Amino acid sequence: MKRLTQLAAGLALASSALVASTSASAEVSYNIGYASEYYFRGVLQKNSSASAGIDYEADGFYAGSWAADVGDGLEVDGYFGYGIEMDSGLSASIGYTGYFYTGEFDDTYQEINFGLGYGMFSLGYSVGEWDGFGASEDYDFLDLTITGESGLYGTVGFWGDEFDGEYLEVGYGFSFADFDMGIAGIINSEELSDEVGSSGRPTTGEAIVFSIGKSW
């Protein structure tokens, strides 16, 4: 699966997968993006990464594909699902996401995604399997996001089962000249970090990520 949180582009995938809502007519949208560092669920994928995606939504059903440069080939994601939003403001969704790779960067991840949202709060839970180059592993992931009307957001995420680690992400997104801009600070646990201390052991990591994207 690789771990994706590429602000303008990666967050578009996460939000579409977790908080889809019903619409009266079919809609197709496209997106392109660039991030100074590509993070997914607290894990660094690549420094300086470009991405592009396409999404379809009709009457609560959504489907799409998203691809990003991961250095050794491409990450290509496919996802679909169904979401509803009730008069009370509560939203719920269920979907599937597959993460595939054209090179040797990683092996396939496949997962089922569940989402709940109400007001400024959204809760996501995913359960999946990593092919592991012949040694498959099961994992799950839980995240809680709080989004403000001003564009500020905060997310805490927790890996479980055969994966381990947690992270905190706080960011701000805004539009400028028809582009989606973003900045985020990420703190991840030593299990997810790519940083090491003077002793050579993994340490907690920190990163500031800038992004720009365009949707139409």
Where are these regions (language model features)?
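Outer-membrane beta-barrel proteins
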Residues: 2-8, 15, 20-216
